[in-house]
Amino acid sequence: MKTFSVAVAVAVVLAFICLQESSAVPVTEVQELEEPMSNEYQEMPVESWKMPYNNRHKRHSSPGGCRFCCNCCPNMSGCGVCCRF
């Protein structure tokens, strides 16, 4: 009889644990609001993406006299390394 009451007690405890886990409210995930992306291409002004170059500031150029710039060398379309200096 003692074994039967222990088995019933264990079954009740397990049932109670299962009920507690199934009734727990799940943590709601915070949904990050994302800005809708527009398909419009926004043109940047040339002054904002051309790299300024001053001959007195040698730290902006590499030892070979080349530098990275955009549309600053002849026959260059886009950005790249220019060694005309």
UniProtKB/Swiss-Prot annotation:
GO terms for biological process: defense response to bacterium; intracellular iron ion homeostasis. Residues 25-64 form a propeptide. Residues 1-24 form the signal peptide. One of its GO terms (cellular component) is extracellular region. It is found in: Secreted. Induction: By bacterial challenge. Keywords: Antibiotic, Antimicrobial, Disulfide bond, Hormone, Secreted, Signal. Disulfide bonds join 66-83, 69-72, 70-79, 73-82. GO terms for molecular function: hormone activity. Predominantly expressed in liver. It holds the Pfam family Hepcidin. Belongs to the hepcidin family. Seems to act as a signaling molecule involved in the maintenance of iron homeostasis. Seems to be required in conjunction with HFE to regulate both intestinal iron absorption and iron storage in macrophages. This is Hepcidin. It comes from Morone chrysops x Morone saxatilis. The lineage of its organism: Eukaryota, Metazoa, Chordata, Craniata, Vertebrata.
